[in-house]
Curated annotation (Swiss-Prot):
Belongs to the FKBP6 family. This is Inactive peptidyl-prolyl cis-trans isomerase shutdown. Residues 92-178 form the PPIase FKBP-type domain. PANTHER family: INACTIVE PEPTIDYL-PROLYL CIS-TRANS ISOMERASE FKBP6. It comes from the Eukaryota. It is found in: Cytoplasm. Disulfide bonds: none annotated. Co-chaperone required during oogenesis to repress transposable elements and prevent their mobilization, which is essential for the germline integrity. Acts via the piRNA metabolic process, which mediates the repression of transposable elements during meiosis by forming complexes composed of piRNAs and Piwi proteins and govern the methylation and subsequent repression of transposons. Acts as a co-chaperone via its interaction with Hsp83/HSP90 and is required for the biogenesis of all three piRNA major populations. It comes from Bombyx mori (Silk moth).
Length: 437
């Protein structure tokens, strides 16, 4: 059997901790690296910080009396410090853990994941025979996905009655474990093997869907969108079979469906399939009021934009922005689309004027204004003239007489535009109006 436990830990522990990640041991300076006592003290402090310190007890016998048996032989005893809200860890799952292993009455671990992967938690696949039996048995008797537990493992459930000389003694060992995550890779396979009566149960549905969603998230992060889509589609199929027994369970199933359809919309957007995005949004319409759901409206807009239906896209983006006025991403999209629409209108007008050999109106008058101001007014008039609907553009207050005369002169060259002036002096207001012909 290939053991997960590092049997050569004692020989390497000083080297590993000295050459380890500085963030893990910030208080260890270069001048103290050769000091064995400081190194051991830092090991002890780190286990405390990571909640991997050995608990206070008089003896393993006294400690074991307060634990529960995981095996009828008493070779594995467990004390759950903190348990997750999910199901028991599946026997064939992949777990992410930190552990520290201690001999009786020791305060420094003889082995720990803190010395592996630069101090990162260790990911282990259960059911492969690559870790000691006692550790695997204990992990499958706690609820995940997050938990803390202590395991007291006898030699028979660890490395055998003789240990692994010279490093591993033939003695009981205490494992202090922090479980960070559980990945149920075979949930879908197990679900398909269940009878229909089991498949419809709420607990089975939730466990399977959570596993499929977790796997889909990992695939999405790796940009494997097609595989993620398959997982979300399977999650929808599982949810449709579910028969919740209470109103709360029914609401939970509904929320999971909403989540799955939204994630499918995102994945289809990533794979450039706007019609599929629309289909997912329409599925959401049958579950919730999408007019009150910003993300659904956003992807309605995305789908229409991808299909070239700019006006429809703007309509949905505006609805989404109304729900989340501070959403900068939606605001930027609307601003970009507005600019694109204006540019398109101006270019379209220029194209038709050229097609009919009509020159763009221009003024020959000379005004006592800045050339940039005159150019900006002309551009604005061309943009307004290119619009098909009524429009009104308010100019800043405080314009000089020459600036107002310049505006009037340029506007007069556009038959569909007019200038509206009201007020006097500093209160004078000037606006350019696009009339409907």
């Amino acid at each position: 059997m290939e053991f997960q436990i590092d049997v050569d830990f004692q020989n390497r522990k000083t080297e590993m901790f000295i050459n380890g990640d500085d963030d893990l041991f910030p208080e260890m300076g270069d001048e103290d690296d050769s000091d064995g006592e400081d190194t051991l003290r830092n090991i002890e402090e780190t286990t405390k910080k990571m909640m991997l310190a050995s608990p206070d007890y008089l003896s393993f016998e006294e400690l074991g009396a307060n634990m529960i048996d995981c095996m009828s032989t008493g070779d594995v005893k467990m004390l759950i410090i903190e348990e997750g809200k999910g199901p028991l860890v599946p026997v064939d799952s992949e777990v992410t853990i930190h552990y520290a292993a201690y001999w009786e009455k020791a305060v420094i671990p003889f082995d720990s994941t803190l010395t592996m992967n630069m101090g990162a938690p260790k990911r282990l696949r259960l059911g492969t025979g690559k870790i000691i039996p006692g550790l695997e048995i204990g992990l499958t008797m706690v609820k995940g996905p997050q938990a803390r537990l202590n395991l007291l493992v006898q030699p028979a459930a660890a490395w055998g009655p003789r240990g692994v000389p010279p490093r591993i003694r033939p003695e009981p060992a205490l494992f202090v474990i922090v479980l960070y995550d559980v990945k149920d890779n075979y949930a879908a396979t197990r679900f398909n093997d269940l009878p229909m009566a089991e498949q419809t149960k709420y607990e089975v549905t939730l466990r399977t869907v959570n596993a499929l969603r977790a796997d889909a998230k990992e695939l999405y992060k790796k940009k494997k969108y097609v595989k993620a889509i398959k997982n979300y589609q399977q999650a929808i199929s599982v949810l449709r079979l579910s028969r919740p027994g209470t109103a709360d369970e029914e609401l939970d199933i509904k929320n999971n469906k909403v989540n799955a359809y939204l994630n499918l919309a995102v994945c289809y957007y990533k794979t450039n399939k706007p019609k599929h995005v629309l289909n997912m949004c329409e599925c959401l319409d049958r579950l919730i009021d999408t007019e009150k759901h910003c993300k659904a409206l956003y992807y309605y807009g995305k789908a229409h934009e991808m299909l070239g239906k700019t006006e429809m896209a703007i309509k949905y983006y505006k609805k989404a922005l109304k729900l989340e006025p501070k959403n900068k991403e939606i605001g930027k999209i609307l601003a970009d689309l507005d600019t694109k629409t204006k540019d398109f209108a101006v270019n379209e007008k220029a194209m038709w004027l050229k097609a009919f050999n009509v020159e763009v109106p221009a003024t020959n008058a000379v005004y006592d204004v800045d050339a940039t101001f005159q150019s900006d007014v002309l551009d604005m008039c061309q943009s307004l003239a290119g619009r098909s609907e009524f429009a009104k553009f308010d100019l800043p207050v405080g314009l000089t007489k020459n600036e107002v005369d310049c505006i009037k002169g340029i506007v007069s060259d556009f038959g569909c535009l007019s200038v509206d002036v009201s007020g006097e002096g500093r209160n004078k207001k000037v606006c350019i109006v696009k009339k409907i012909v």
